[in-house]
Amino acid sequence: MTISEARLSPQVNLLPIKRHSNEEVEETAAILKKRTIDNEKCKDSDPGFGSLQRRLLQQLYGTLPTDEKIIFTYLQDCQQEIDRIIKQSIIQKESHSVILVGPRQSYKTYLLDYELSLLQQSYKEQFITIRLNGFIHSEQTAINGIATQLEQQLQKIHGSEEKIDDTSLETISSGSLTEVFEKILLLLDSTTKTRNEDSGEVDRESITKITVVFIFDEIDTFAGPVRQTLLYNLFDMVEHSRVPVCIFGCTTKLNILEYLEKRVKSRFSQRVIYMPQIQNLDDMVDAVRNLLTVRSEISPWVSQWNETLEKELSDPRSNLNRHIRMNFETFRSLPTLKNSIIPLVATSKNFGSLCTAIKSCSFLDIYNKNQLSNNLTGRLQSLSDLELAILISAARVALRAKDGSFNFNLAYAEYEKMIKAINSRIPTVAPTTNVGTGQSTFSIDNTIKLWLKKDVKNVWENLVQLDFFTEKSAVGLRDNATAAFYASNYQFQGTMIPFDLRSYQMQIILQELRRIIPKSNMYYSWTQL
């Protein structure tokens, strides 16, 4: 090899990503299709079991008719309070504002939908519901969403043939925020539902104002230092509008009141409902009993299924009771337990296999094992060499930092230093002389390629998506709500923090990486400072 050829960068052989072949995908699809056909044949041969299975899945999915739904015991006090507030707004035409606080999947929106569905049967034309989500709507799109939903629901109440001429619904969302809310107030104040009631020879005309129910999911996203104009105008509607308005906000922030400005807080009713959680094992067992007990005689197997279920729940040594106890002592999450039971019911071919599955709970063991394989340790084993190198470099920087934080620039600088240290110990060029011709040649040993920073950015984003890194604002509690907002919102006063300067924290430390990474790995020596 000549000197000019030696100056060229060595060819890098990239390891291909292992993907499933088309044959494997087709084989898996064929197995699933065959299993589906077998299940359909079993349902056709035993229609009673098919009805029972569909009923159980409806109860687990929460898609039963409103009259047949069962509220869990630990949620009933909260449900009664929500029921009282909604009835005061819709029936007695009062205005209220409430915030529901609880973790995700704690049945906040479920209880609101349940109560509104019950009242929809008797007071269908006396209220409309407007739903907004902080993850979907910004302040401006929320105004457009309010206008669109008002138009659609008011036309349903008045009928598609009747036109509302007081305010142009097409231009309700145009103009400034103050003008928009003036149009909304004018529209709500002028919108009435007129009914003619015939009683013999006397015609009486009754006029009923329409209650507007706002449901805000993730209301805390509208409560930042620069995004509270929407909440201020809505809470001001509750105080001064002649039309009854009821606002329900759902959030996971325990200190939501600290997020509100003084002018917003002065118009808020200060009513906060904290969603109750399962406190003891009996509540968990009772919730599972309500989920799986069939209360209507839709199949000849119903009574036998209820007896089998009650026997398993009453026996403290049963496999089902063991899984309930394990969930209570670890996750304490009813949705997690429910998600593990759904495949058990859906894959049963007949009543005998369903009873056997609920007694053995072998499917629940497989499900839990599969979920645990999706933890950080399992994900770490799927990383490429470059991703692993960047992860270890970030962990080294985090261990040296006083607060355990790091950014992309610091992690890349550590990666660059470690790669150069390894390459410096590898002889790159070794001159040799050909005896016959007397010409000097060079043999080149392969060194580790140092990837450019622009190429590593994609790897960094993958590690963030895999939850190895978490933004510093999402870890721990802040001194106040304003500090939390500043930390989690990079766009403030027209400036934006660059991608490579955002602070992160590790979800797996360097000592844990040393225990997981095999000693044969080329980066194992990096796991120790």
Curated annotation (Swiss-Prot):
Gene Ontology molecular-function annotations: DNA replication origin binding
Alphabetized UniProt keyword annotations: DNA replication, DNA-binding, Nucleus, Phosphoprotein
Phosphoserine found at: 9
InterPro entries: ORC4 (IPR016527), ORC4_C (IPR032705), P-loop_NTPase (IPR027417)
Cellular localisation: Nucleus
Superkingdom field: Eukaryota
GO biological process, one term: DNA replication initiation
Keyword DNA-binding: yes
Purpose of the protein: Component of the origin recognition complex (ORC) that binds origins of replication. It has a role in both chromosomal replication and mating type transcriptional silencing. Binds to the ARS consensus sequence (ACS) of origins of replication.
Description of how the protein assembles with itself and partners: Component of the origin recognition complex (ORC) composed of at least ORC1, ORC2, ORC3, ORC4, ORC5 and ORC6.
Protein family (similarity comment): Belongs to the ORC4 family.
Additional note from the record: Present with 2170 molecules/cell in log phase SD medium.
Protein name, as recorded: Origin recognition complex subunit 4
Organism: Saccharomyces cerevisiae (strain ATCC 204508 / S288c) (Baker's yeast)
